């Protein structure tokens, strides 16, 4: 609804039906609130990706399931990208930034495992660098996010997700 940097602790407390004092009994500062929110985001996004990729028939199908789960997460929680991008613009190294770095590291590990499994199964070309494949995957999601932010409609991500992943698949797939 708002630019995260413009959201006051009074507004946060009001939305949570708390007093500002009650909010500060749980959080030492506004930055601590953002850190907790981003930790919640990280936990939920990774759980959603894990659930989506569990028991999927192949590594490439699991990558697609992860991609679609990530897109759906952003559609359900459209404030998350605004908060992330706002926080990442800050010059100082904040606890929230560290939480985002941890999220990307854990997410990247999951994706790298799927990419390596895809190479081993012959679904993905062996020539593709794993780190590059992971960066391209995350960058493709981020591109959809940026387009949806510009359009002011997070649901646009759903419409573009299948085509975006199809391009990713063609770039990474083994010729077999």
Which stretches of residues belong to each language-model region?
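Short, hydrophobic secondary-structure boundary micro-motifs
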Residues: 82-84, 97, 123, 127, ...
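Amphipathic C-terminal alpha-helical segment
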Residues: 72-76, 113, 117, 137-155, ...
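Helix-turn-helix
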Residues: 1-32, 36
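Hydrophobic alpha-helical connector segments
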Residues: 36, 50-80, 130, 134-137
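Secondary-structure edge/capping motif, primarily at the C-terminal ends of alpha-helices
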Residues: 52, 88, 148-151
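Amphipathic alpha-helical segments used for helix-helix packing
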Residues: 75-95
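Amphipathic alpha-helical packing segments from all-alpha helical-bundle domains
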Residues: 43-46, 50, 76, 94-121, ...
């Amino acid at each position: 609804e708002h630019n995260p940097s413009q959201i006051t602790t009074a507004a946060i407390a009001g939305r949570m039906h708390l007093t500002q004092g009650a909010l500060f009994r749980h959080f030492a500062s506004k930055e601590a609130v953002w850190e907790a929110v981003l930790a919640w985001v990280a936990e939920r996004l990774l759980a959603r990706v894990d659930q989506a990729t569990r028991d999927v028939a192949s590594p490439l199908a699991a990558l697609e399931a992860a991609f679609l789960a990530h897109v759906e997460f952003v559609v359900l929680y459209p404030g998350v990208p605004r908060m992330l991008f706002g926080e990442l613009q800050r010059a100082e190294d904040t606890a929230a930034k560290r939480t985002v770095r941890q999220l990307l590291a854990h997410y990247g590990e999951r994706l790298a495992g799927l990419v390596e499994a895809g190479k081993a199964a012959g679904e993905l070309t062996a020539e593709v660098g794993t780190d590059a494949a992971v960066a391209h995957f995350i960058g493709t999601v981020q591109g959809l996010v940026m387009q949806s932010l510009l359009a002011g409609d997070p649901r646009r991500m759903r419409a573009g997700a299948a085509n975006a992943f199809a391009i990713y698949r063609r770039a990474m797939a083994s010729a077999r």
